Amino acid sequence: MKEKKNWLGKVVLLIAVIAAVAVYFLVPGVNKMMNKVFTMFASGDFTVVRDFVASYGAYAAVISFLLMIFQSIAAPLPAFLLTFANANLFGWWQGAVLSWTSAMAGAAVCFYIARILGRDVAEKLTSKSGLAQIDTFFERYGKNTILICRLLPFISFDIVSYAAGLTSMSFMSFFIATGIGQLPATIVYSYVGGMLTGGTKLFVTALMILFALSALIFMLRKIYMDRQSKKEKGRI
């Protein structure tokens, strides 16, 4: 039964990929739109992302939700730009809810792509070295890897989701850890995004560095406690 489900999942994903490729090449304007989206994320300017989302008017929230899933699959596009844009457009807490739920959906998609299609596909969508780095985290910290990596802004959110799908971790364990782990960053980024203007890059950079240092201290403390625990066991 399990093999049948995996086979069915692979067929569904394969059909979805073929359909996406066909649409990209055959539907007028889609190629141009995709290039525009990639250029938008590559700009590193949240105002560009905000204006793009806002241009869809009443459908802005839907477009934002789809963009978050898209950037999750096409790792490592920067999700925080979209989080800033959501907060700036919809208000900080409404933007936080939109960013959190859409990021959870994106994480679930990445997890199942890796779980069903395997490492080769995950490496093509991310990078071999990136997955290897997260593999090392999983070997050292197990399920705690999800929480640790979600707190580190310099580690790709999406690569962690792909890597988790390649482990024996259950989807529910992954989903819960992801929801808890990404919540603090989503709230902080959304609160800041609600106040952002084009000239506050220095403040944002300082905030991200502070957040990264806090997470690093947490991780180092965890490593120290683990080593101390092993030493005490060795003395017994």
Predicted features, each with a name:
Residues 65-94, 154-160, 172, 179-188:
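Transmembrane helix boundary and interhelical junction motifs in multipass membrane proteins
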Residues 88-103, 108:
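Structured, soluble extracytoplasmic/luminal domains of envelope-associated proteins
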Residues 83-84, 111, 120, 162, ...:
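Transmembrane alpha-helix boundary and packing residues in multipass membrane permease domains
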Residues 2-10, 20-64, 104-159, 166-167, ...:
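Membrane-interfacial helix-loop-helix
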Residues 93-100, 133, 166-180:
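Membrane-interface alpha-helices at helix entry/exit sites of multi-pass transporters
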Residues 186-204:
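Extracellular/periplasmic helix-loop-helix junctions in multi-pass membrane proteins
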Residues 63, 98, 176-177, 189, ...:
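Hydrophobic core positions of alpha-helical segments in small-molecule transporters
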Residues 67, 102, 106, 180-181, ...:
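Transmembrane alpha-helical core residues of multi-pass small-molecule transporters
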